């Protein structure tokens, strides 16, 4: 009778170990989604605290993640129908859209603070960086923001002086 008990305990220990190991396995997709969320939250927290440089670094981290995911998707493009590639592509789009939205928010931050040259530079950076067809709505919003800035703070023109 002790033999079946020992076997039963071994089985229970084996099941418990399997469950523990399974819970330790990482879902890299979820980890990266959480990283994007954390960097985006930190971006806005830094803007609220007027730590612009830190906010920019957080957004650059999101851009780097999107770029890395884009490379992974391109390398695995031949594996069509792969749920891993589809998840990676969806996460890449999310990271890219998040970063673009954050740049627009940074431009708005500068405009509110009446730092018009920085706002213009931020919008131009966004327009120059996000050139894919899927980025069009963000580019158009940045172009509208530039036109709005021109109404608030017309660009200075240097005219030649007459001697």
Locations of the language-model features?
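Bacterial Sec signal peptide processing site at the extreme N-terminus
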Residues: 20-42, 56
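Residue-level signature for tetratricopeptide repeat
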Residues: 42-45, 49, 109, 149
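Sec-dependent bacterial lipoprotein signal peptides
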Residues: 1-25
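Alpha-helical linker/edge segments of TPR/alpha-solenoid repeat scaffolds
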Residues: 78-103, 108, 144-163
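Short solvent-exposed coil/turn linkers within tandem alpha-helical repeat scaffolds
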Residues: 30, 65-79, 90-97, 128-141
């Amino acid at each position: 009778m002790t033999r079946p008990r020992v076997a039963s305990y071994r089985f229970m220990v084996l099941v418990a170990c399997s469950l523990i190991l399974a819970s330790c396995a990482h879902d890299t997709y979820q980890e990266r989604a959480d990283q994007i969320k954390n960097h985006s939250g930190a971006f806005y927290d830094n803007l609220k605290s007027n730590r612009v440089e830190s906010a920019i670094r957080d957004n650059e981290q999101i851009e780097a993640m999107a770029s890395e995911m884009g490379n992974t998707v391109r390398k695995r493009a031949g594996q069509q129908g792969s749920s891993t590639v589809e998840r990676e592509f969806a996460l890449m789009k999310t990271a890219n859209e998040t970063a673009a939205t954050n740049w627009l928010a940074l431009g708005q931050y500068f405009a509110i603070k009446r730092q018009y040259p920085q706002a213009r530079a931020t919008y131009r950076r966004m327009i120059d960086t996000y050139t894919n067809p899927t980025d069009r709505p963000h580019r158009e919003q940045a172009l509208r923001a530039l036109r709005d800035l021109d109404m608030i703070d017309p660009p200075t023109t240097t005219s030649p002086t007459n001697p």
